[in-house]
């Protein structure tokens, strides 16, 4: 799974070029395992554009929007994506820190919002459980694994995505995986 952000794609010349570069990399390196190309933390229009140019997966991040608008736009992204064979990740609650201009305070994902987002037809759910983007401060209290357990009980057997994986202690990541996290995003440690 290779993820691009809105900022990285803009810097590199756009989503179509990013997709072409990744495909060329896969071919020139002789990579034989399937490679998914994913948009991370995309706004509505960016998610639709990535679907149009052939990304295999998108994350629509409407967590900064009012809940009803987030759900409505997620459902529209799902409809267009699934019609084109593309999977969709969406976020409820907010992941703390900043990514591509989306700033989150790091609230815990409300359980009812998570259930409503899953009902839109998304394939993966990113949910705030105390995780943040960027370096973790020394006074960080850790993941709210009790909240993650409530979340996974509310949406059983549904793939949960843990953003902000850089800097989370291994034992907490392992505990989160045992509770239902199916994908862990890391990026900060690749940049520092």
Regions found by a protein language model. Give the residues of each.
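Glycine-rich beta-strand-to-loop/alpha-helix junction loops that act as flexible
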Residues: 162-166
């Amino acid at each position: 799974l290779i993820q691009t952000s809105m900022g990285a794609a803009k810097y590199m010349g756009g989503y179509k070029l990013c997709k072409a570069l990744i495909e060329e990399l896969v071919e020139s390196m002789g990579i034989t395992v399937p490679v998914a190309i994913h948009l991370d933390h995309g706004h509505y229009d960016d998610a639709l554009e990535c679907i149009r140019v052939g990304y295999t997966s998108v994350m629509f991040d409407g967590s900064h929007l009012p809940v009803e608008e987030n759900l409505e736009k997620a459902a529209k992204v799902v409809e267009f994506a699934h019609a084109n064979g593309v999977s969709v990740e969406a976020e409820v609650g907010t992941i703390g820190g900043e990514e591509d201009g989306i700033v989150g305070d790091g609230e815990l994902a409300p359980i009812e919002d998570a259930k409503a987002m899953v009902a839109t037809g998304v394939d993966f759910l990113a949910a705030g459980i105390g995780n943040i983007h960027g370096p973790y401060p020394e006074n960080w209290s850790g993941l709210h694994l009790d909240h993650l357990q409530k979340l996974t009980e509310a949406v059983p057997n549904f793939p949960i995505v843990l953003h902000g994986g850089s800097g989370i202690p291994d034992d907490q990541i392992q505990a989160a995986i045992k509770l239902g996290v199916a994908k862990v995003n890391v990026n900060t440690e690749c940049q520092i």
